[in-house]
Amino acid sequence: LSISMVVLKESGEEDHVMQYYVGEFDGRTFQAEQKAHILDYGTDNYAAVTFQNAKAAILLGWADSWDYVYKVPAQDYRGTMTLARKLTLQQIENQYYLCQKPVGIEAFPVVDTPKPDGIWRMHICYDRAYQLSWQTQDGAGIELLINDTSVITKRTHPQETEAALVCSAPRLIAGEAQMDIVADGNLIEIYAENGLVSMTVKLW
């Protein structure tokens, strides 16, 4: 069960978050069997839905944030969707987590280093620590940091101070893990911890 929530911050601002529950549904009532987990630790995956009667559990989200959707520079249209993601459950100790794998990722060209624009993907193996950063052509920047306990994404822009952002997620894999980064223009989708931690961030 996934829920799109509006959470009130201490500052009075709203935070838009998706979380999910693992449990049993008998056709009328859902019974959660464990605590809720965050679906996406970035800011640009909201109101995601799955498809009834599909052969697999496929998730598709709105790749924007109500916090700044009207401030992001745009022409002709203002709205994008995430890649479709195949969902499976994986148990880590006594908790079940959703593993998210982008559908059709093979069609994206593979690069060794991030590009400032265009469509590309990277596949990365990491262990205790990892760091990666790049900029778009208009100066928007993103930095990815991984340490023993956290996966952290920082977004910056030299002119747009409102674009500053820090997202943090807990590490779930002990030891070596894998990560896919998929870029489509200014939309970055990060699938870390073997797909157990996702972050969707729009650069602007």
Per-region residue spans from a language model:
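Internal metal/ion-chelating core segments
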Residues: 1-34
